[in-house]
């Protein structure tokens, strides 16, 4: 079993900061790294720069106890968690420059035995690409793509699966998918997350872990889009969509979601494009223009000319602010 005393979290947004604070609350020494000087200063004062229930209390306690400290420059640690944005460039192409920058930033402080984890939602192959960038910057160390199980540095992907507004609870309670580039990488990553995760830590390979997160969010995207289109159709046909869905869901194998203002959040509306980019020739259904307009560009009932704001919108998830 791998022992960890210190963790560096690269990117202190809506995933990185809660993750850093949660590790710190379990007694690890945590170094949070971010290029945003304001975020760094705010955290070091025991405050938070994003809105997330309970996060302020966890951060304040961790900083007060000396377990969490923020900086703009990476420092040595036993494990590194990369939680930076993965936006799109023109043409719906994933932009991995933040991952590349993070890799080059941590490379100088890596030492034999360290673990590097990519948490950012990424196209398939991004973890391997991150490992390649690290290897290029540190030719004196061996990495999984060349040395396999015997590599000096272990590399894995562990996608976040939390709901904004419930991040602190779900970080601890949700199952985690652990995808290492080798079995040794997976085991080391599982040992790290077991420090605070009460859910199951399920081991697989890096590519499967990457695809798992994309599949989860794409599945939700499709189902939300279906519910929203039903709402528009029912409005045309003078049918109560809520009653319709309630009755249809009495079928034991049907579970239609409720219509709403469309797909939101940081991931669900864009993750299908990661799948398309990873296998454009094979992702014919998801990449088909008409289908893409429906599920990927899903604007929900707001695109409907007769969209109406109803009290049911109050049932939406609480509003939260922040970047990954």
Show where each model-derived region lies:
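Structural/interface elements that position substrates and couple domains in central-metabolism enzymes
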Residues: 1-324
